[in-house]
Amino acid sequence: TIFSFLLRKIFKESKFISLENLIKLNALARPQYAYCAYYSALLAKKLSYDKISFIEFGVAKGNGLLYLENLAARIEKELNIKIEIYGFDTGEGLIHPDGYRDLPYFFEGGMYKMDIDKLQKRISKSKLIIGDVKHTVKNFFTDYKPAKIAAIFNDLDYYSSTINSFNLFNADVENFLPRVFCYFDDVVGSSEEMYSEFSGELLAINEFNNSNENSKFSLNTNLQHLDLNWKNQIYYLHHFKHSDYNVFIDPKEQIGINNSISLK
């Protein structure tokens, strides 16, 4: 509606409104980042974790990583939780596409090359992990000892790079939240991109689900009724065998539901 549009314009990125309300208004430059970052941190708080990590796969020029830093600062203040940020990138742009599954009709090697020195000077808390994700994820947990991974922002474009990034999940599930908030950039596109479940990030997601019994990506269902152009890019990674997966997290909401169904 026009009223909703005006509200978004008036309050966009406002420092005087809580981040949660800005997300509900869709009044943010990168609402999909804010949604995953904020609600993953809120889940962590409900599970009594005092520190979490965000990961961005495919940093490119670095605008998303810088935005994530700003989000983290607000979330740390609003929710009283510590946040670490890690950004994975080759530093040299996209690698050469490996067959049709990497969508060579739309992407080519060398695109989105990073100016590493320039970005290093701009970031404040993020750690850049430079190299082919096929190799850099292997020792990530031993080399960096990150706090539990709460949210992952995946913009690797290719099937091959995306499926290689999923090797991160070969680690113990206790390194993650029991349910990880995930954003996939290249699952909703244009008539030229023509993304499908037979290539790109969607194929990687399907293959992961087919080969893993105890961890599954699931497209969100809670945003589907909303008019959001990013709603089909939000997935949840369920780790069913996580020690905290079955922990009851929201008694206040259940109290409200119980009261609402009471006989009058």
Regions inferred by a protein language model and the residue ranges of each:
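Conserved alpha-helix/loop element of class I SAM-dependent methyltransferases that forms part
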Residues: 34-50
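S-adenosylmethionine/decaboxylated-SAM
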Residues: 10, 15-27, 47-264
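Conserved SAM-binding loop and adjacent beta-strand
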Residues: 25-36
